[in-house]
């Protein structure tokens, strides 16, 4: 089969997307504007607002409103293409129920937890908010304050939040919603390579001979990257595509090899491949001997449940989940030898010939393999292990850090990499892979921030799941949520999420652009600017940092998260939040506000507004009197320059279509850790995994372990949750786009037809999905894109009217603390 690239682009990017979504694209797909009236539009560049692919778009503005967008032909990521969500970017900011003023729960003229929402001014909102935060800080200390942020924060918004929480309020109770999606990937990188984020880039796609998808439906979740994979598959017929999943989905349509496996058995399959490589003598011994070491990880590590849970009580190594010990290659070979073809086929349910064919793709030294994975790996009670184990395979064969040979973790949010991971908005991190538990790292941050020694606390803060538990238990009492919808996204939300938000002891603030399940659970709602209503920067999955200008004003009184964070800092005198002994080390800070110390510190405020581009507005710069974004970025960039995370100067990014770090002497890095590509690799070494002190990557011996909950007689089905092409995350933006809403208006329960028949239900019939934790009502779907095997159901989570996370289990990976949304036990009950 052959297809011209032009035809491929037309059919894949437009027709296929439209067919899947059921959306007429007439008027939205035309990239060349010829109408005279339309030609008066002002066009500017920006990265897409949705997933972590980082597509470039051109944005048209007229009369202070975004009126059109199209794929940016000059963007290397997408080369002019858009997915169906990208086609409708111009509509995401203009839902009729946009939040435009602060709303506070009021009763009898004053704030009350049981009050009704009423409009207030920003001053009133911040007065009440500051009063509540100061009360908690005084009564309980900084550990009773928390913030839940986002992989959708811009780089400088995340950096400002990091400074406010970890240096200002002196608490590490800051975590992003990327904990739900990328924590296992980040910890996997750190354990194997000593440094976070992929070594490869999207150029691997055009150089690979085989693609293996592990728990990733790229056709719907990363459709533009999927068009590039499809292009490679069709233009190079020898290229193979293998897809592994617990149920059949759209990505199966391109696959040469499909493997539908029993949930959790991917662990065994990964070990089988390693065993096959060793047994057939295809180990790249020269690479392995020079560039790797072997360790055996602790097993029986529990499931991240509450400490009193029986499974946690029974786990032998729950207190040292990330521990490991050194072993030899021979020890590793013996360890994986158990995972032979017979055992793995029986455990996984995958036919032997398919397992062998998959293993051969990795084992064949002539085949360049790129592995892609997303939530199927990461949202897993052994997600860190999955990440480590796929690296094992690439390291054993030396298929890493060269064009086409790449283990590639894909991200789901536009700046889960650039903000959550690189900036370090996790409860244990600081910028550029630094961590709060390392005293040298803390001192380095304090020096850059011009703070006294001991400002940053050494104790790891509460991660996302623990934050909900602490809110419920009354241990966190002042809490700020920004750019996420956790009361729709959190597992076991009715038992472990909502009770904490409505706990009478707690004051909950939610900043968002639209009403959501989470805003309705709050005490104070702050209206947020979104996307091109502010100047921003995102970092995508291939380490590409991209900037955009503010193109339009936010409606009403909506303000950016950056403005909210920085303005709120003015409400606190240093004496109100720091102990006397700390302040004594910097007596010149006495009487100053956190704003003075953190943001008007002589570094962040060093760039005057005369450096602004006169073509564009910048509300934050006008509000504070200096180029705030540039000051924050340049201070943040100090952490990474010279340390393998080099960023280019601020002004460069507004001209470029993004650059992949490390950027050294103006040159971006495509493949890390390889001599000749990565400037940090010493000449003569070939490869150098310099994140680890010895320059070597770690190959981990890790076992198969069962999930915490599996189907039984009472709850006979596996439940998996996830996304669909038309909607993004909780749907708070995409469900307000009429075309996307109509294409997929509500969630359904995808089920095998034979299971439906056995239950006496038909397509479209209402059922309840019931677990040990809760239940929700939806309709049965036995046809369409997702085709579960018997015994498994799939329910998307985008629908605020059908909260599937009432049902899910709040078990996490005990190392990364990322939730497993992909497997728990349920029963289906006809209504």
UniProtKB/Swiss-Prot annotation:
Residues that hold [4Fe-4S] cluster according to the record: 48, 51, 55, 83
Annotated substrate binding sites: 797
Keyword Kinase attached: no
UniProt GO MF annotations: 4 iron, 4 sulfur cluster binding; electron transfer activity; iron ion binding; molybdenum ion binding; molybdopterin cofactor binding; nitrate reductase (cytochrome) activity
Compartments where found: Periplasm
Keyword annotations of the record: 4Fe-4S, Electron transport, Iron, Iron-sulfur, Metal-binding, Molybdenum, Nitrate assimilation, Oxidoreductase, Periplasm, Signal, Transport
GO BP: cellular respiration; Mo-molybdopterin cofactor biosynthetic process; nitrate assimilation
InterPro entries documented for this protein: Asp_de-COase-like_dom_sf, CT_Nitrate-R-NapA-like, MoPterin_dinucl-bd_dom, Mopterin_OxRdtase, Mopterin_OxRdtase_4Fe-4S_dom, MopterinOxRdtase_cofactor_BS, Periplasm_NO3_reductase_lsu, Prok_molybdopt-oxidoreductase
Domain 4Fe-4S Mo/W bis-MGD-type: 41-97
Primary location: periplasm
Domain of life from the UniProt record: Bacteria
Catalytic activity: 2 Fe(II)-[cytochrome] + nitrate + 2 H(+) = 2 Fe(III)-[cytochrome] + nitrite + H2O
Alphabetical list of PROSITE patterns matching this protein: 4FE4S_MOW_BIS_MGD (PS51669), MOLYBDOPTERIN_PROK_1 (PS00551), TAT (PS51318)
Cofactor(s) annotated in UniProt: [4Fe-4S] cluster; Mo-bis(molybdopterin guanine dinucleotide)
Gene Ontology terms: cellular component: membrane; nitrate reductase complex; periplasmic space
Modification note: Predicted to be exported by the Tat system. The position of the signal peptide cleavage has not been experimentally proven.
Free-text comment on the cofactor: Binds 1 [4Fe-4S] cluster. Binds 1 molybdenum-bis(molybdopterin guanine dinucleotide) (Mo-bis-MGD) cofactor per subunit.
Gene3D superfamilies: 2.40.40.20, 3.30.200.210, 3.40.50.740, Dimethylsulfoxide Reductase, domain 2 (3.40.228.10)
Record function comment: Catalytic subunit of the periplasmic nitrate reductase complex NapAB. Receives electrons from NapB and catalyzes the reduction of nitrate to nitrite.
UniProt xrefs under HAMAP family: Nitrate_reduct_NapA (MF_01630)
Subunit architecture: Component of the periplasmic nitrate reductase NapAB complex composed of NapA and NapB.
Family the entry assigns: Belongs to the prokaryotic molybdopterin-containing oxidoreductase family. NasA/NapA/NarB subfamily.
Name of the protein described by the UniProt record: Periplasmic nitrate reductase
The gene coding this protein: napA
């Amino acid at each position: 089969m052959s297809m011209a690239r032009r035809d491929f682009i037309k059919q894949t990017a437009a027709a296929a997307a439209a067919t899947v979504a059921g959306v007429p694209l007439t008027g939205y797909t035309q990239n060349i504007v010829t109408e005279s009236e339309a030609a008066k539009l002002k066009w500017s560049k920006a990265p897409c607002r949705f997933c972590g692919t980082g597509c470039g778009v051109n944005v048209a503005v007229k009369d202070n409103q975004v009126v059109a967008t199209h794929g940016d032909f000059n963007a290397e990521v997408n080369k002019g293409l858009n997915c169906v969500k990208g086609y409708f970017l111009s509509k995401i900011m203009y839902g009729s129920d946009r939040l435009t003023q602060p709303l506070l729960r009021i009763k009898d003229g004053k704030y009350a937890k049981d009050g009704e929402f009423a409009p207030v001014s920003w001053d009133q909102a911040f007065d009440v908010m500051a009063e509540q935060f100061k009360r908690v800080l005084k009564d309980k200390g900084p550990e009773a304050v928390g913030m839940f942020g986002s992989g959708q924060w811009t780089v400088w918004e995340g950096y400002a939040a990091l400074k406010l929480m970890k240096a200002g309020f002196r608490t590490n109770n800051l975590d992003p919603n990327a904990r739900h999606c990328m924590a296992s990937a980040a910890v996997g990188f750190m354990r194997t390579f000593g440094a976070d984020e992929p070594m490869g880039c999207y150029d691997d796609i055009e150089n690979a001979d085989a693609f293996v998808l592990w728990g990733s439906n790229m056709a719907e979740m990363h459709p533009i990257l999927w068009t590039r994979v499809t292009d490679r598959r069709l233009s190079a017929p020898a290229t193979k595509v293998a897809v592994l999943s617990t149920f059949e989905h759209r990505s199966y349509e391109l696959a040469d090899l499909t493997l539908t496996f029993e949930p959790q058995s991917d662990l065994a399959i990964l070990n089988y491949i390693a065993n096959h490589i060793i047994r057939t003598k295809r180990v790249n011994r020269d690479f392995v001997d020079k560039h790797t070491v072997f360790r055996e990880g602790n097993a029986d590590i529990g499931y991240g449940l509450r400490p009193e849970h029986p499974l946690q009580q029974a786990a032998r190594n729950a207190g040292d989940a990330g521990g490991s010990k050194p072993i030899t290659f021979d020890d590793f070979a013996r360890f994986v030898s158990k995972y032979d073809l017979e055992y793995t086929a029986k455990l996984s349910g995958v036919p032997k010939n398919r397992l062998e064919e998959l293993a051969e793709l990795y084992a064949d030294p002539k085949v360049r393999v790129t592995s892609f994975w997303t939530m199927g790996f990461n949202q897993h009670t052994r997600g860190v292990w999955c990440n480590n184990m796929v690296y094992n395979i690439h390291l054993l064969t030396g298929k890493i850090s060269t064009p086409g040979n790449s283990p590639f973790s894909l991200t789901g949010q536009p700046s889960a990499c650039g903000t959550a991971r690189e900036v370090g908005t996790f409860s244990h991190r600081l910028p550029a892979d630094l961590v709060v538990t390392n005293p040298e790292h803390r001192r380095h941050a304090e020096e850059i921030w011009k703070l006294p020694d001991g400002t940053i606390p050494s104790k790891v803060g509460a991660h996302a799941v623990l934050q909900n538990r602490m809110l419920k238990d009354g241990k966190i009492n002042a809490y700020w949520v920004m750019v996420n919808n956790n009361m729709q996204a959190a597992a076991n939300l009715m038992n472990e999420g909502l009770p904490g938000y409505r706990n009478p002891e707690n004051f909950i603030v939610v900043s968002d652009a639209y009403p959501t399940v989470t805003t309705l659970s709050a005490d104070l709602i702050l209206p947020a600017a979104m996307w091109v209503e502010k100047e921003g920067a995102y970092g995508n999955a291939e380490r590409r940092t991209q900037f955009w200008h503010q193109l339009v004003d936010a409606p009403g009184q909506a303000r950016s998260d950056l403005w909210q964070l920085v303005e709120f800092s003015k409400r606190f005198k240093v004496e109100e939040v720091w102990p006397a002994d700390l302040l004594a080390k910097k007596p010149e800070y006495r009487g100053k506000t956190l704003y003075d110390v953190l943001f008007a510190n002589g570094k962040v405020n060093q760039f005057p507004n005369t450096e602004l581009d006169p073509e564009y507005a910048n509300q934050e710069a006008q509000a504070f009197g200096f180029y705030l974004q540039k000051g924050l970025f340049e201070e943040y960039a100090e952490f990474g320059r010279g340390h393998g995370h080099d960023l280019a100067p601020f002004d460069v990014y507004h001209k470029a279509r993004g650059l992949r770090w490390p950027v050294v002497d103006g040159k971006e890095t495509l493949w890390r850790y390889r001599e000749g590509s990565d400037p940090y690799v010493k000449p003569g070494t070939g490869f150098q995994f310099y994140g680890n002190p010895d320059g070597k990557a770690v190959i981990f011996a890790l076992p198969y372990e069962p999930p915490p909950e599996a189907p039984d007689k009472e709850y006979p089905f596996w439940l998996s949750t996830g996304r669909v092409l038309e909607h993004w995350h909780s749907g708070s933006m995409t469900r307000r786009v009429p075309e996307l809403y109509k294409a997929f208006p509500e969630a359904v329960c995808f089920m095998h037809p034979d299971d439906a028949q056995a239950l006496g239900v038909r397509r479209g019939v209402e059922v309840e999905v019931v677990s040990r934790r809760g239940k929700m009502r939806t309709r049965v779907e036995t046809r369409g894109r997702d085709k579960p095997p018997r015994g498994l159901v799939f329910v998307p989570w985008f629908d605020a009217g059908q909260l599937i996370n009432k049902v899910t289990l709040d078990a996490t990976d005990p190392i990364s603390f990322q939730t497993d949304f992909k497997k728990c036990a349920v029963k289906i009950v006809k209504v």
